[in-house]
Amino acid sequence: MRKAIISLWVVLVGVLGVSAQSGKSVSILGDSYSTFQGYVQPETNVVWYWDSPDAQNTDVHSVRETWWHQFILKNGYRLCLNNSFSGSTVCNSGYKRGNPDFADYTDRSFVTRMTNLGCPDIIFIFGGTNDAWAGSPIGEYKYGGWTKEDLFSFRPAMAKMLDFMINRYPNVEIYFILNDGLQEEINESVKTICGHYQIPCIVLDGIDKINGHPSIKGMTQICEQVETFLSGR
């Protein structure tokens, strides 16, 4: 009898342990839209969303209001790593800010940070917005043999990033989230390159924003549109 009780206890502990760990883990490679104070890695990454925000910039004041936290919480997932950096571009060319040349964003670009996403089950890449806003060079479609110079243009940097990620993160679900309201050249480039690498592209629509960034309502819309896309697969 005692052996039977012990065996049952071992089985229950094992089942509960598996259940507790069964939720998929999620990593985010993003820009300001996916930041929140205290929830990005490395901690030195610049953030847009704070727990005491400027009301002129946003009405988001809790991490629970961000699109990714809502998505993770609603689906029983776990956060692996959020490597988002406000103002970051996919390529290495950043904002001119009154200067004649593009700023060198190699220290914060997606194509640099793509190596640091942990070991997740799902990765969301949410970028391209700052490349569009900064007017970064669009470049040509190029699917191999990238040079350092190539990575200062959007198309080759985007291709390099996806090529690297499907090899660095095998058997991981990778999705690209495309913001609404961007130039058609960026939209077409993202869809074409995602198609080449067979990366699903979630195209957002009608996102509510304050100062160009998702509001609380917009964050919920993003979460819902991501969920709708995934449920249809």
Residue ranges and their predicted role:
Residues 34-36, 91, 132, 222:
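Short, electropositive, low-hydrophobicity segments enriched in small/polar residues
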Residues 30-32, 84, 180:
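A mature extracytoplasmic/lumenal domain signature
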Residues 42-139, 213:
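Conserved SGNH/GDSL esterase-like catalytic core that processes O-acyl groups on lipids
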Residues 1-63, 72-74, 116-118, 170, ...:
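N-terminal secretory targeting modules
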Residues 11-14, 20, 27, 84, ...:
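Generic detector of intrinsically disordered, low-complexity, polar/charged segments
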Residues 22, 101-233:
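Alpha-helical cap/lid subdomain in secreted, periplasmic
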